[in-house]
Structure formats: C-alpha cells, structure tokens
C-alpha cells in the first residue's frame, strides 16, 4: 500500500542561494528531485552539516511513515522527516542525510550479567525471528535501480517494487520481480558499520525467500570480508568469549560493539550485576566492494546526521554508476528506529540529478 508523503525544498534557501549566484538554484528541477551541486572542494565528512559545501546545496525533504518506535510510545508506529543534500566533484558523490529520531538506539542485543552471575543475551520477547524492535540499533537505507529494467518499475512503484508482504515475515521479503532487475542498497547500520565509517554496500536481486537457502531472499551483501560486516560473540561456558580491551561495560562508558582487533579474552571479574557487554565484533570493510560507501555519523538534539561519500563510478556490477551527468537516478529512503525491519519510508521515488559544473 502506498503511503502519503511530502517532498519540499526550502524557499528561503533557494532565495538566499539565488542572491549569491549559486549555479545550482539557477537550474530547474522537479519537486521530487535532489540537485547535486558541483564543488571543486570536497566536504569534510567529519564536519557534518557545518561544512560550507552544504550551505550552497539545495535541500530535498520527504516524509517517512509507518516505522516502528517513531510513535509516541515504544513500539508504536510513527513518522519522521528526512532532509537530503548532495554535492559532487570530478569523481565523487557526497550526500548530507538528516532525519528526526527522538532516541539514539545503541543497545543491539547485548549480554547482561544476571544476579546469579550468569550472562543473558537481551532480546525482544515478541521477536519471532528477524524482528527485534527493543534491543537493536538505528539504521537507514537507500535503494538505487542499477539498470533500465529496474528503473522502469521503480519509477512507478518506488521501493515498494521490492517489498513483498505476507511472506512469513512481519514486513515481508525483499526481492526484485524479474531476472536482471537489480537494486543497489546502501544500508547504514548504526552499531555494525557506522562506528568504522562505513555504509554496508548491499544489493537486492530476484532471489525468492527460502528458509534454508535464502533466508534474506534477494537482499545480499556485495563481496566483502569473510564473515561479513560483523562476527557474533558466543557464550562459552556460560560467559561471553570476548570483551573489549578497555574492559568497560557498554552501559558504563563502553560500547555495544567491539572493533576487530580490539577483542581480548573475557574476564568475568571485571563486571558486576546489571553490566552489559557487546555481542558483536565489527569488521572493517575497507578495500572491498562492500566498503565503497563511507560515512561520518553523529546524533544531537533528536537528529541523526550522516555525511556520505562514494565514487561516482565504482565499476562494480552490484552498484549504481553515476556515469552520465545528464541522467536522473531514482532512489528511495527508509529509516529504522531501533528496529530490525520495521522501517519508516517514503514509498514514492525520489531522483538525484547533477547540476552543471
């Protein structure tokens, strides 16, 4: 079912930029289009929204609806708004992504020490498989058609073309409808990829769901490190096998992830009842197809901010290639508030277009 949404650009911003002669605002684009402004100086990802490049870029905003935990109470569905800006250099695309979220969710499936000294992995009691909405992380995702066969249907249906409800999972399964259709997926995972500065570069093809051979249906990762973006920490003799080198509890100044190479043998004596520790070791994606998209993330005043970069042309068959500056490139956006799959989304397609140099 299509959800209602609103696209908007800031009239005040357009007027201001027109006065200073910004090339981008002299170019007319449709209300559903995000105009990438050419810049000779790349934005500093770590500077967030304050980098001067973003003051010259026109925003595009879209309403996101139907996402778990975005409502007034935990678990309730609600809405958010995402605001996007884009810029490009001779060989790179940059995007500023900001959306409202009242909570910064970081407690992704931690182990917690119990009163009797045992360790328990915290999990949503209502989760029947792949649907945790209590102990998870904040995420966002973008989908990009990679070829004309995919774009033709995406133009009509947006992200909904790949969402198939009523197929064993609360939010269905994700796959394209025809052989040859391929969606490039940028999947920013707040605790698994974001801390190392990566967006998980994935894709969606026409693989149907099979509980044994294709539990994720058509959603797959680009070629990357062995084990994927993270490795789970197991319980050994009732205790987590590893802990972070600093031996801090995650809920007392530590983190809910362990960076690869920072794991050490677990020392139970370092923790007291109620302490929580990470259940994941996160792997760097650098130097792999899966690590093509970089990000710098921050959270403040109820707002997530990501500054993203990717080569215009990666050469990967799993990626959208921004090779033709005269084309428009369809995309969709979804935000996840402490939810594994129950995302808030704008189902109608948006389009990235490139301004003149």
Feature map (PLM): residue ranges:
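Bacterial N-terminal signal peptides that target proteins for export
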Residues: 1-10
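C-terminal motif of bacterial Sec signal peptides marking the signal peptidase cleavage site
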Residues: 18-21
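Acidic/polar low-complexity flexible segments
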Residues: 24-52, 111-271, 314-357
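Short, well-ordered beta-strand segments enriched in hydrophobic/aromatic residues
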Residues: 47, 92-99, 304-310
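Beta-strand-rich interaction surfaces with strong enrichment in secreted/lumenal proteins
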Residues: 72-73, 82-85, 293-299
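N-terminal onset of structured domains
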Residues: 77-93, 98, 104
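Short alpha-helical segments and helix-capping/turn motifs at coil-helix boundaries
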Residues: 78-82, 124-129, 291-293
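Extended, compositionally biased non-globular segments
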Residues: 257-322
């Amino acid at each position: 079912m299509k959800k209602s949404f609103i696209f908007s650009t800031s009239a005040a911003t357009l007027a201001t930029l027109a006065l200073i002669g910004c090339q981008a605002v002299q170019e007319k684009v449709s209300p559903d289009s995000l105009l990438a402004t050419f810049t000779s100086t790349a934005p500093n990802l770590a500077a967030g929204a304050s980098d001067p490049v973003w003051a010259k870029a026109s925003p595009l905003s879209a309403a996101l609806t139907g996402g778990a935990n975005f409502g007034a109470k935990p678990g309730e569905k609600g809405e958010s708004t995402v605001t996007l800006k884009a810029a490009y250099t001779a060989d790179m695309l940059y995007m500023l992504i900001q959306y409202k979220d009242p909570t910064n969710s970081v407690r992704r499936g931690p182990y917690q020490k119990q009163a009797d000294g045992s360790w328990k992995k915290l999990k949503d009691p209502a989760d029947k498989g792949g649907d945790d909405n209590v102990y998870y992380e904040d995420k966002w995702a973008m989908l990009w058609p990679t070829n004309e066969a995919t774009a033709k249907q995406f133009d009509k249906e947006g992200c909904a073309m790949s969402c198939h409800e009523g197929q064993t999972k609360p939010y269905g399964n994700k796959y394209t409808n025809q052989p040859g259709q391929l969606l490039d997926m940028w999947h920013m995972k707040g605790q698994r990829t974001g801390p190392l500065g990566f967006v998980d570069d994935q894709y969606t093809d026409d693989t149907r769901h099979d509980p044994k051979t294709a539990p994720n249906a058509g959603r797959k990762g680009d070629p990357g490190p062995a084990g994927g973006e993270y490795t789970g920490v197991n319980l050994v003799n009732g205790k987590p096998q590893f802990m972070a080198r600093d031996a801090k509890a995650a809920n007392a100044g530590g983190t809910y992830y362990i960076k690869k190479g920072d794991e050490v043998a677990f020392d139970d004596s370092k923790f007291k009842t109620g302490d929580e520790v990470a259940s994941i070791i996160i792997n760097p994606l650098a130097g792999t197809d899966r690590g093509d998209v970089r990000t710098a993330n921050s959270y403040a005043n109820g707002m997530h901010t990501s500054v993203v970069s990717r080569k215009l042309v990666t050469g990967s068959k799993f990626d959208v290639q921004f090779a033709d500056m005269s084309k428009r490139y369809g995309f969709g956006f979804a935000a996840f508030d402490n939810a594994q799959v129950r995302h808030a989304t704008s189902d109608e397609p948006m389009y990235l277009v490139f301004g003149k140099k």
